[in-house]
Curated annotation (Swiss-Prot):
SUPFAM superfamilies: GroEL apical domain-like, GroEL equatorial domain-like, GroEL-intermediate domain like. It comes from Methylacidiphilum infernorum (isolate V4) (Methylokorus infernorum (strain V4)). Belongs to the chaperonin (HSP60) family. Keywords: ATP-binding, Chaperone, Cytoplasm, Isomerase, Nucleotide-binding. This is Chaperonin GroEL. One of its GO terms (cellular component) is cytoplasm. The gene is groEL.
Amino acid sequence: MAAKQLIFDESARHALLRGVEKLSKAVKCTLGPAGRNVILDKKFGSPTITKDGVTVAKEVELEDPWENMGAQLVKEVASKTSDVAGDGTTTATVLAESIYKEGLKNVTAGANPMDLKRGVDKAVQAVVKQLKEISHIVKGKEEIKQVATVSANWDTSIGEIIADALDKVGKDGTVTVEEAKHIETTLEVVEGMQFDRGYISPYFVTNAEELEAVLENAYILIHEKKISNLKDLLPLLEKIAKAGRPLLIIAEDVEGEALATLVVNKLRGTLQVCAVKAPGFGDRRKAMLEDIAILTGGRCLTEDLGIKLENVQLEDLGRAKRIIVEKENTTIIEGSGSRSEIQGRINQIRRQIEETTSDYDREKLQERLAKLAGGVAVIHVGAATETELKEKKARVEDALHATRAAVEEGIVPGGGVALLRCQKAIEGLSLKGDEQIGANIVYKALEYPLKTLADNAGLEGSVIVNEVKAKKGNEGFDVAKRSYVDMFEAGIVDPTKVTRTALENAASIAGLLLTTEAMVTEIPEKEKKPATPAGAGGMGDMEY
């Protein structure tokens, strides 16, 4: 095991501070409508230009190992805040730097770091409680648009599109963000349930121009296994032909004589039919087939039920008003399933989402929930250049996450006003000694987001903070218009969840940094001088 180097006490804490300050300086310049861009060098391709705090933070690696530890810990504040709330990464970084910097001054002056941390934690609890009390529930499309606009760095077009998307698919619907092939940013809403499987054979196509098969008022056969034997399928096909309605077959696969018969009957016009492979794999496939069965009012024919294909009745089939099958996607619109059964399935999936510990499983469950509950909206982000496209897509994703957070926990006045108004909660605490000093550190830190917003706009931050403190309620400073306004009326709002998460994460890491007493890292290897090549000696008389 290689030898390690250690540093202790003040040396350790000040090394951490240098790293925290360097990271914070790079990140906090992006805060607010007057925030600046940061250019990130990439080993391949053109540099990335961004105003997204967490994107900047993730790129920072410092040469000094002690300083780098501080930077990496604050980077975690930004990443965790982004993961949980989708935004507020820059605010979290500013708060972490402020709490640690002020706390370190007091530790250096002789305060007990453990008592300071307890004071910080108690102050944060009081502020979080106050934030929830001043929070407003998001009502209507206009307020959703305001939140999205603020989170997208004041881009009203992005705010409008996100508000439209959430309005159309509802709070349980899925909104995905994709890169467009043109320069405009557009919204596409997929009605009904869509899954990523297309027709097995192109002979099933009914619309040659669009290369799609459209089935109106169709029956749906949902089968877990492969269908290859015609004998098993024939009784059902005869019943379908008598009923005179189209049929969609969803199975693991359709092959051999079964597929040939379906194609021949489709081409002759005897039967309007289309076959697609079942979506997903393994247990997830079975769950998705059950979802389709419940949505369409049919039965999923699995081995567990013991129903043979030749014994299937028309009552066992699902039904839908319209089905569109493309080369790679199938969309089922207006399934005939019972509303109560669909709601029961939705509640079951919600419980699974709460219980799961896997991010991947949670994402897949949320997709299933969206397909059953509200549908799927796709925002196609367009831009003139690839560099702009990357930056814009990151802003859209941030704004979308923040908007969902706002719908979840409500909104508070933006522009740093909510945190400033929560100073009253700390004034109401009765603490003693170093715990009171810890609470005072948080009290002062709550001014920093507003101060940074004003500093980025080229104004005197301390003056703006004092002006806003003298005002009441939701009144604050509109940095873009350089005037004092009611933040709610001006549409300058932040999701409560974003503000809460930023403060909690910042205080958590700052508290850990304050109570650090020693640091350990590997000794950097010294570069070895290259060995003299063999036979290089004795060449002194040679001329060059």
